[in-house]
Protein backbone atom coordinates (compact mmCIF):
# COMPACT_ATOMS: atom_id res chain seq x y z
CA UNK A 1 0.00 0.00 0.00
CA UNK A 2 2.84 2.36 0.80
CA UNK A 3 4.34 1.98 -2.67
CA UNK A 4 0.98 2.77 -4.27
CA UNK A 5 0.72 5.99 -2.23
CA UNK A 6 4.21 7.03 -3.36
CA UNK A 7 3.27 6.48 -7.02
CA UNK A 8 0.08 8.55 -6.62
CA UNK A 9 2.01 11.33 -4.85
CA UNK A 10 4.69 11.22 -7.54
CA UNK A 11 2.03 11.59 -10.25
CA UNK A 12 0.46 14.54 -8.44
CA UNK A 13 3.86 16.16 -8.05
CA UNK A 14 4.60 15.58 -11.73
CA UNK A 15 1.23 17.03 -12.73
CA UNK A 16 1.78 20.14 -10.59
CA UNK A 17 5.29 20.55 -12.04
CA UNK A 18 3.99 20.31 -15.63
CA UNK A 19 1.24 22.85 -14.94
CA UNK A 20 3.69 25.20 -13.23
CA UNK A 21 6.29 24.99 -15.98
CA UNK A 22 3.73 25.42 -18.75
CA UNK A 23 2.38 28.54 -17.06
CA UNK A 24 5.88 30.04 -17.11
CA UNK A 25 6.10 29.79 -20.89
CA UNK A 26 4.60 32.72 -22.76
CA UNK A 27 4.84 32.80 -26.51
CA UNK A 28 3.60 36.32 -27.12
CA UNK A 29 3.96 37.68 -30.61
CA UNK A 30 4.71 41.37 -30.86
CA UNK A 31 4.26 43.28 -34.07
CA UNK A 32 7.26 45.50 -34.50
CA UNK A 33 6.98 48.15 -37.16
CA UNK A 34 10.04 49.57 -38.82
CA UNK A 35 10.50 53.29 -39.31
CA UNK A 36 8.90 53.29 -42.76
CA UNK A 37 5.74 51.54 -41.51
CA UNK A 38 5.50 53.91 -38.56
CA UNK A 39 5.88 56.88 -40.89
CA UNK A 40 2.92 55.56 -42.90
CA UNK A 41 0.83 55.75 -39.71
CA UNK A 42 2.14 59.25 -39.13
CA UNK A 43 1.25 60.23 -42.69
CA UNK A 44 -2.37 59.17 -42.18
CA UNK A 45 -2.68 61.43 -39.14
CA UNK A 46 -0.84 64.29 -40.84
CA UNK A 47 -2.94 64.25 -44.02
CA UNK A 48 -6.23 63.99 -42.13
CA UNK A 49 -5.09 66.75 -39.79
CA UNK A 50 -4.49 68.99 -42.80
CA UNK A 51 -7.91 68.18 -44.25
CA UNK A 52 -9.64 69.06 -40.97
CA UNK A 53 -7.68 72.29 -40.54
CA UNK A 54 -8.45 73.33 -44.14
CA UNK A 55 -12.15 72.59 -43.52
CA UNK A 56 -12.06 74.66 -40.33
CA UNK A 57 -12.96 71.63 -38.19
CA UNK A 58 -10.52 72.38 -35.41
CA UNK A 59 -12.16 70.09 -32.85
CA UNK A 60 -11.57 67.10 -35.13
CA UNK A 61 -8.11 68.42 -35.95
CA UNK A 62 -7.34 68.42 -32.23
CA UNK A 63 -7.64 64.69 -31.71
CA UNK A 64 -5.76 64.04 -34.96
CA UNK A 65 -2.95 66.29 -33.73
CA UNK A 66 -2.78 64.39 -30.44
CA UNK A 67 -2.78 61.07 -32.32
CA UNK A 68 0.00 62.30 -34.58
CA UNK A 69 2.02 63.53 -31.61
CA UNK A 70 1.59 60.17 -29.86
CA UNK A 71 3.04 58.45 -32.96
CA UNK A 72 5.95 60.90 -32.79
CA UNK A 73 6.40 59.97 -29.12
CA UNK A 74 6.57 56.27 -30.00
CA UNK A 75 9.06 56.98 -32.79
CA UNK A 76 11.24 58.98 -30.35
CA UNK A 77 11.25 56.05 -27.91
CA UNK A 78 11.84 53.36 -30.50
CA UNK A 79 14.31 54.92 -32.91
CA UNK A 80 17.22 56.20 -30.87
CA UNK A 81 19.28 55.16 -33.87
CA UNK A 82 18.40 54.01 -37.37
CA UNK A 83 20.36 53.44 -40.54
CA UNK A 84 18.44 56.25 -42.29
CA UNK A 85 19.00 58.79 -39.51
CA UNK A 86 22.15 60.69 -38.64
CA UNK A 87 21.05 60.91 -35.01
CA UNK A 88 18.22 59.90 -32.71
CA UNK A 89 14.74 60.76 -33.97
CA UNK A 90 14.13 62.75 -30.78
CA UNK A 91 16.68 65.35 -31.92
CA UNK A 92 14.80 65.85 -35.19
CA UNK A 93 11.53 66.09 -33.28
CA UNK A 94 12.91 68.69 -30.87
CA UNK A 95 14.52 70.78 -33.60
CA UNK A 96 11.88 70.53 -36.31
CA UNK A 97 8.52 69.24 -35.08
CA UNK A 98 8.03 70.68 -31.60
CA UNK A 99 7.39 74.27 -32.71
CA UNK A 100 4.78 73.56 -35.41
CA UNK A 101 2.97 71.08 -33.17
CA UNK A 102 2.83 73.63 -30.34
CA UNK A 103 1.66 76.24 -32.81
CA UNK A 104 -1.16 74.04 -34.13
CA UNK A 105 -2.15 72.98 -30.61
CA UNK A 106 -2.36 76.61 -29.47
CA UNK A 107 -4.33 77.59 -32.58
CA UNK A 108 -6.82 74.80 -31.92
CA UNK A 109 -7.22 75.91 -28.29
CA UNK A 110 -7.74 79.50 -29.45
CA UNK A 111 -10.01 78.37 -32.32
CA UNK A 112 -7.78 80.23 -34.75
CA UNK A 113 -8.07 78.47 -38.12
CA UNK A 114 -5.63 80.84 -39.82
CA UNK A 115 -2.90 80.17 -37.24
CA UNK A 116 -3.63 76.43 -37.37
CA UNK A 117 -3.15 76.52 -41.15
CA UNK A 118 0.13 78.42 -40.76
CA UNK A 119 1.29 75.86 -38.21
CA UNK A 120 0.26 73.02 -40.48
CA UNK A 121 2.20 74.48 -43.42
CA UNK A 122 5.23 74.88 -41.15
CA UNK A 123 4.84 71.26 -40.03
CA UNK A 124 4.80 70.01 -43.63
CA UNK A 125 7.85 72.12 -44.50
CA UNK A 126 9.72 70.79 -41.45
CA UNK A 127 8.80 67.19 -42.35
CA UNK A 128 10.15 67.71 -45.86
CA UNK A 129 13.34 69.35 -44.58
CA UNK A 130 13.93 66.34 -42.32
CA UNK A 131 13.42 64.04 -45.30
CA UNK A 132 15.93 66.06 -47.34
CA UNK A 133 18.43 66.05 -44.45
CA UNK A 134 18.29 62.25 -44.37
CA UNK A 135 18.12 61.62 -48.14
CA UNK A 136 14.61 60.21 -47.96
CA UNK A 137 12.93 60.50 -51.33
CA UNK A 138 9.41 61.15 -50.06
CA UNK A 139 7.64 64.47 -49.90
CA UNK A 140 4.91 65.38 -47.47
CA UNK A 141 2.13 67.26 -49.25
CA UNK A 142 -0.26 69.95 -48.08
Predicted regions and their residues:
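Bacterial N-terminal signal peptides that target proteins for export
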Residues: 2-13
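Hydrophobic helical h-region of N-terminal Sec-dependent signal peptides
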Residues: 14-19
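C-terminal motif of bacterial Sec signal peptides marking the signal peptidase cleavage site
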Residues: 21-23
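The canonical Cys-X-X-Cys-His
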Residues: 123-134
Amino acid sequence: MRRKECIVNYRHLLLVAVIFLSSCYHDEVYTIKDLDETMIDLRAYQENLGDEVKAGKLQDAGWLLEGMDSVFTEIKKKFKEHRKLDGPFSSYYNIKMKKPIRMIRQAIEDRDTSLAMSGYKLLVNKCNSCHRDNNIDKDVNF
